[in-house]
């Protein structure tokens, strides 16, 4: 498994996929590859993401390698095992940035969550309709521009109107992490994707 972890942390997608295939052919279960391979690699990346060591390019390359392996393991596009919970991710209407959302999707997928991506520029109705249809446990909203803040503040109210009071609401991104959870009317404001993943691990356990 250490060879897969090494390939992932090197950001080498082709080598990562080849190693995942080799492990599968040798009898490793998909769950083991995700938990002991992808999961451990993401944990190590998390540990490096201090202010001094933060490297956005490295995260993007690792993310690309991780998602390549995930697609190899789940060719139908959705994990059939080790689902720890269903999470909806999006950038709200008016925000066309999706880097932060993509990193969060990578981290959560690596940790065994079923992640539904509503994309960028996503209307609130689409977000909550998807959350209801997919029986989501949480929604994660990424915001890079301040104009989405009024929309974020409405998510809780609209979720309650749809009978989705149980859903955890997370916010993150440059425009949102300056605010408090109370101000945004959400459960948690994440400084980083890893921070958000740690909160979900605790909240949904």
Question: Across the structure, where does each feature detected by a protein language model lie?
Answer:
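Solvent-exposed alpha-helices and their adjacent loops that cap or buttress functional pockets
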Residues: 79-82, 161-163
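Glycine-rich active-site/cofactor-binding loop and its immediate structural neighborhood
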Residues: 82-118
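Short acidic-hydrophobic, aromatic-tinged amphipathic segments that line or gate anion-handling sites
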Residues: 187-192
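Long amphipathic alpha-helical segments
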Residues: 1-81
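Alpha-helix N-cap/loop-to-helix initiation residues
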Residues: 55, 96-97, 148
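Short glycine-enriched loops at secondary-structure junctions
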Residues: 39, 92-95, 121, 175
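A charged, well-structured terminal subsegment
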Residues: 199-205
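Cofactor-cradling patches in redox/metallo enzymes
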Residues: 104-111, 116-186, 199
């Amino acid at each position: 498994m250490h060879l897969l972890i090494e390939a992932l942390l090197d950001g080498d997608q082709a080598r990562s996929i080849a190693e995942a295939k080799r492990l599968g052919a040798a009898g490793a279960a998909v769950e083991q590859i995700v938990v002991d391979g992808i999961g451990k690699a993401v944990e190590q990346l998390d540990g490096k993401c201090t202010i001094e060591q933060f490297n956005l390019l490295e995260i993007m390359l690792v993310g690309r390698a991780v998602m390549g392996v995930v697609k190899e393991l789940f060719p139908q596009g959705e994990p059939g095992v080790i689902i720890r919970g269903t999470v909806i991710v999006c950038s709200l209407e008016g925000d066309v940035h999706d880097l932060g959302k993509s990193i969060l999707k990578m981290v959560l997928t690596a940790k065994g969550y079923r992640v539904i991506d509503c994309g960028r520029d996503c209307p609130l109705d689409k977000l909550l309709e998807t959350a209801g249809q997919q029986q989501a446990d949480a929604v994660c909203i990424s915001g890079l521009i301040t104009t989405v803040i009024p929309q974020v503040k409405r998510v809780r109210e609209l979720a309650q109107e749809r009978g989705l009071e149980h859903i955890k609401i997370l916010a993150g991104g440059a425009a949102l992490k300056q605010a408090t959870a109370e101000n945004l009317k959400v459960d948690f404001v994440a400084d980083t994707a890893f921070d958000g993943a740690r909160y979900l691990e605790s909240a949904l356990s």
